[in-house]
């Protein structure tokens, strides 16, 4: 499922608008490093201390199925949000030429639905793996997302006067909570 999202993402990046502002490399590093740490934790269990490979979720089909459903739902939600952004999307924080504020589709529920979907999928992956490394990976990725949200919010407030109202009315990452 993750591979399917990667293929979709790759093709969807071909026709984005040109950027008129880009996030600095230093700022980008602050959200990319935790994401990479999370990916390593999930992908390379034999490199990790044994405590991170300790199973914390009971084995069995029900947790695996629930995890797989969360992965599918989360990736689907993220893909929907990405498609809704259209040419405004970028993998790094940018301000595009003729940038438009999107408040429809999944953006009605949360301001950063791509991260919401990816986080749900990652939690599902961690549940399926069932080890401490999954929990630690989720924490690292959440830290990366929270930094990126902070940077994106600053740019959105600077470029869209109506963003302040959208921010008051719509949760950032988790509907009705945050």
Where in this protein do the model-derived segments appear?
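Short, conserved phosphate/pyrophosphate- and ester-handling motifs at nucleotide-, phospho-/glycolipid
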Residues: 112
């Amino acid at each position: 499922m993750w591979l399917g999202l990667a293929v979709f993402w790759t093709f969807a990046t071909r026709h984005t608008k040109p950027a008129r502002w880009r996030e600095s490399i230093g700022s980008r590093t602050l959200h990319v490093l935790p994401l990479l740490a999370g990916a390593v934790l999930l992908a390379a269990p034999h490199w990790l201390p044994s405590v991170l490979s300790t199973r914390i979720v009971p084995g069995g089909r029900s947790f695996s199925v629930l995890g797989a459903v969360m992965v599918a739902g989360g990736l689907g939600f993220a893909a929907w949000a990405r498609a809704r952004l259209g040419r405004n999307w970028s993998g790094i924080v940018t301000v595009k030429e003729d940038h438009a504020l999107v408040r429809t589709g999944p953006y009605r529920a949360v301001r950063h639905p791509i991260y919401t979907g990816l986080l749900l999928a990652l939690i599902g992956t961690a549940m399926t793996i069932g080890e401490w490394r999954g929990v630690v990976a989720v924490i690292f990725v959440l830290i990366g997302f929270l930094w990126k949200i902070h940077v994106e919010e600053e740019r959105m407030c600077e470029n869209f006067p109506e963003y302040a109202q959208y921010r008051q009315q719509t949760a950032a990452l988790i509907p009705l909570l945050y």
